[in-house]
Design a protein with these regions (language model features):
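Interface-prone segments of viral and bacterial extracellular assemblies
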Residues: 1-188
Length: 188
């Protein structure tokens, strides 16, 4: 919840807009999203999955982001309790309870460059790379991610610059995407 006062110049509009998931009060750097079903990827193969993820609320004065308000954030530890990373947590059952304007699909491209079949149950996505576009119908579109598995316990997750969905006429960029990578070293 946001509580505070904003000094607004008389001609600057104040707007509430969707924003990619943020680190919340703990300042976490990643989003751990658990898949509804396990996904098995054969050696040398690739596939894509779509996962619903939560959005936060951005408070803007003109084109300036004032603050981000996380909407019902949940947290989980990825890895062992003494070395793991605290992440923002998302799963299908949590996100389905949110209003459609507070969630969006993310496309995650899974690629297996190992020599064995891998089972993928989750993805840990760096938050700082996620961007957000708005469609002509005012639908929020988050940027996609790529998960490349090197072994049963090691993968690289990289954010991409394009929206997860191909929608005609997407031109409004609300949050600039960047390429960021997270190394999943505690299993898939």
């Amino acid at each position: 919840m946001f509580q505070g006062t904003i000094s607004v110049p008389s001609k600057k509009p104040v707007a509430i807009m969707p924003h990619p998931p943020s680190g919340g009060k703990y300042g976490v750097e990643c989003l751990l999203t658990k898949f509804y079903n396990d996904i098995y990827v054969l050696p040398g193969e690739a596939t894509s999955v779509y996962q619903q993820v939560p959005l936060d609320i951005g408070l803007y004065c003109g084109n300036t982001l004032v603050t981000v308000v996380p909407i019902r954030p949940k947290y989980a530890l990825y890895g062992p309790s003494d070395l793991g990373d605290l992440c923002r947590y998302s799963s299908s059952d949590i996100v389905q309870d949110l209003s459609p304007c507070l969630r969006t699909p993310i496309k995650i491209r899974l690629s297996n460059i190992s020599k064995t079949v891998v089972r993928v149950t989750k993805a840990v996505i760096p938050l700082k790379g996620l961007g957000l576009y708005i469609s002509p119908e005012r639908m929020p579109l988050i940027t996609s991610a790529k998960l490349v598995t090197h072994s049963l316990s090691y993968a690289e997750v990289t954010t991409e610059l394009l929206p997860s969905l191909e929608v005609e006429g997407v031109s409004k960029l609300l949050v600039e995407p960047s390429i960021a990578t997270y190394i999943m070293r505690y299993g898939l």
